[in-house]
């Protein structure tokens, strides 16, 4: 009767994948034929490999937990009237075993497992103030990513120790197992459980990276923010992702920008939007008022003098050309700044002002309610203009 695989590795049934892996590595080093010359060590080593091959594979582990060794041979599935191919490693492995016999595809597969692997890309979310997005600049960020271990140089081996050819697969990175199916006998090709497909094993793993060849490192980066960016803009920083494995190139860092709102300005594409409050007399008679722009708020210039034409209506939009958002890649080309007039109607006036307004209303032949004073006639008309009616409702 076959021994229990969990018992072989000395782990419980609820052990994590990482715990199973650690137990396997510890036992594999202890009973490796190159290290342990005692009788029975080689058979024990094969037993350990078989146990790890099953328990490290989610599908095989699930079948073993449910049906035991019989579930791995297909007996449990056959009893239910059909053949389950989950334990065969998939049809890709079957086809691969065919081509291995005729075209040497197995060697190609092993080389792909042992070849360079590009590092993972990383994402970093960066908040910008409104004016930082408009004018750009430089931001310093701190990221954590994988870099080639500075102790072992990426080999994964402790300095002074060797990286040896895997004795299980002979350096090919793969193992073969004969499988019986309703279609006949097939040779299944799978990743070597000892070396994980690399074809090499460590005499002793590096203490800094635990044999991975890569170590987590925190570093500072300076990111150049182009003028005119907006929320959702993505910046690519080449080569600042995780380091590659086995000499592969590093991944990239993608910085996603999120722009915070501003109390004075809004943005619509390349257009800056704002409001300016003027009195009803300024709207009627015309005036010149100072208004802030994104440039003045950034300290690049003084506030701009805006001309209010006589007879301006509430909601009138005045435009400052070239005072908007710079175009990305061409900061000399800018959008406009559109300013909406908000006409303020006073709720209290002096008796002298009321007398003047009543005389003005009489000149225009306006009928006014004397009990309401200035709330009638001209001022009533101003108050009922669309832009100001909305503001009164607020």
From Swiss-Prot:
Predominant location: cytoplasm
Any GO molecular function: unfolded protein binding
CXXCXGXG motif repeats mapped onto the chain: 149-156, 166-173, 192-199, 206-213
Disulfide cysteine pairs (residue numbers): none
GO biological process: chaperone cofactor-dependent protein refolding; DNA replication; protein refolding; response to heat
List of residues binding Zn(2+) 1: 149, 152, 206, 209
Pfam families, alphabetized: DnaJ, DnaJ_C, DnaJ_CXXCXGXG
Coiled coil regions, renumbered to chain: none
Cofactor(s) named in the record: Zn(2+)
Note on cofactor: Binds 2 Zn(2+) ions per monomer.
Sequence positions that bind Zn(2+) 2: 166, 169, 192, 195
SUPFAM superfamilies linked to this entry: Chaperone J-domain (SSF46565), DnaJ/Hsp40 cysteine-rich domain (SSF57938), HSP40/DnaJ peptide-binding domain (SSF49493)
GO cellular component: cytoplasm
InterPro entries with a match to the protein in the record: DnaJ (IPR012724), DnaJ_C (IPR002939), DnaJ_domain (IPR001623), DnaJ_domain_CS (IPR018253), HSP40/DnaJ_pept-bd (IPR008971), HSP_DnaJ_Cys-rich_dom (IPR001305), HSP_DnaJ_Cys-rich_dom_sf (IPR036410), J_dom_sf (IPR036869)
Zinc finger (CR-type): 136-218
Places the protein is found: Cytoplasm
Keyword Metal-binding included in the entry's annotation: yes
Family in the record: Belongs to the DnaJ family.
Domain comment quoted from the record: The J domain is necessary and sufficient to stimulate DnaK ATPase activity. Zinc center 1 plays an important role in the autonomous, DnaK-independent chaperone activity of DnaJ. Zinc center 2 is essential for interaction with DnaK and for DnaJ activity.
Name of protein: Chaperone protein DnaJ
The organism's taxonomic lineage, starting at the top: Bacteria, Bacillati, Cyanobacteriota, Cyanophyceae, Synechococcales
Gene name in the database record: dnaJ
């Amino acid at each position: 009767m076959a021994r229990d695989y969990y018992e072989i590795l000395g782990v419980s049934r609820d052990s994590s994948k990482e715990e199973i892996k650690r137990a396997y590595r510890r036992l594999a080093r202890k009973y490796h034929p190159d290290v342990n010359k005692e009788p029975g060590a080689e058979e024990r080593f094969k037993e350990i490999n078989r146990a790890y091959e099953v328990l490290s594979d989610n599908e095989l582990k699930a079948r073993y937990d449910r049906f035991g060794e019989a579930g791995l041979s297909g007996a449990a599935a056959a009893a239910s009237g059909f053949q389950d191919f989950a334990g065969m490693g998939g049809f890709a492995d079957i086809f691969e075993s065919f081509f291995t016999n005729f075209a040497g595809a197995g060697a190609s597969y092993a080389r792909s497992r042992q070849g360079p692997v590009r590092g993972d890309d990383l994402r970093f979310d960066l908040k910008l103030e409104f004016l930082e997005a408009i004018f750009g600049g430089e931001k310093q960020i701190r990221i954590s990513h994988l870099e080639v271990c500075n102790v072992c140089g990426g080999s994964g081996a402790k300095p002074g120790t060797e990286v040896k050819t895997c004795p299980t697969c002979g350096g090919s990175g793969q193992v073969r197992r004969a499988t019986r199916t309703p279609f006949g006998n097939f040779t299944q090709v799978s990743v070597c459980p000892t070396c994980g497909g690399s074809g090499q094993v460590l005499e002793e793993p590096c203490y800094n990276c635990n044999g991975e060849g890569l170590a987590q490192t925190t570093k500072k980066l300076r990111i150049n923010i182009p003028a005119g960016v907006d929320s959702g803009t993505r910046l690519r920083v080449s080569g600042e992702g995780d380091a590659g494995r086995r000499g592969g190139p590093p991944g990239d860092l993608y910085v996603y920008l999120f722009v915070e709102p501003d109390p004075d300005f809004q943005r619509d594409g390349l257009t800056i939007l704002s409001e300016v409050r003027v009195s009803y007399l300024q709207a009627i008679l015309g005036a010149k008022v100072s208004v802030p722009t994104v440039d003045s708020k950034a300290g690049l210039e003084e506030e701009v003098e805006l001309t209010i034409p006589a007879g301006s209506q509430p909601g009138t939009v005045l435009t400052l050309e070239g005072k908007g958002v710079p175009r990305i890649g061409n900061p000399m080309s800018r959008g406009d700044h559109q300013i909406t007039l908000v006409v303020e109607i006073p709720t209290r006036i002096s008796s002298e002002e009321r007398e003047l307004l009543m005389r003005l209303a009489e000149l225009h032949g306006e009928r006014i309610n004397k009990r309401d004073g200035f709330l009638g006639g001209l001022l009533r008309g101003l108050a009922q203009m669309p832009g100001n009616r909305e503001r009164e409702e607020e």
